[in-house]
Amino acid sequence: VGLKLIDNGKHPACLLDAENLANGIYFCITKDVAHNQTYFFMDDWNISWKQYFTDLAAMKGKTIGSSIPFWLAYFVASVAEIAFPLVGKNPPLAKKSVKATGTNRTISTQKARTELGWKSEVNYDESMRRIKESLN
């Protein structure tokens, strides 16, 4: 069956490269202004789930499957989460995954950018290059 996009993969992929996260954590530890504060980190790549999954699949010479609407994916996940454990198996689709890729989950990183001076140092192309390298 393969990977199916939810709502054509139109929603933003809320991605965060590990190095960019590490930089954010470093700023939280080393900057006094961060004491007792909460910050959100998310790369500003403006990449859709469709592009991200297409790029990942291409690394392995694969293509992504068709798309299903959010409501159908959520319904299937809801049923699977009940039915599969009854036969001792993990469901192939989870409601949490459907929500993560089938809705807009972007967050504001303005506070981290303003107060900590944080930004995405590693860009999308470099992050994808690193992922591809790790797969080989």
Where are these regions (language model features)?
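A short C-terminal helix-loop "cap" of Rossmann-like NAD(P)-dependent dehydrogenase/epimerase domains
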Residues: 1-7, 89-91
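Amphipathic terminal alpha-helices
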Residues: 107-115, 119-136
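Glycine-rich Rossmann NAD(P)(H)-binding loop
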Residues: 6-11, 39-46, 57-60, 101-103, ...
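Mid/C-terminal beta-alpha module of Rossmann-like enzyme folds, strongest
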Residues: 27-92, 129-130
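Residue-level signal for the nucleotide or nucleotide-sugar donor/cofactor binding architecture
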Residues: 13-19, 47, 107, 122
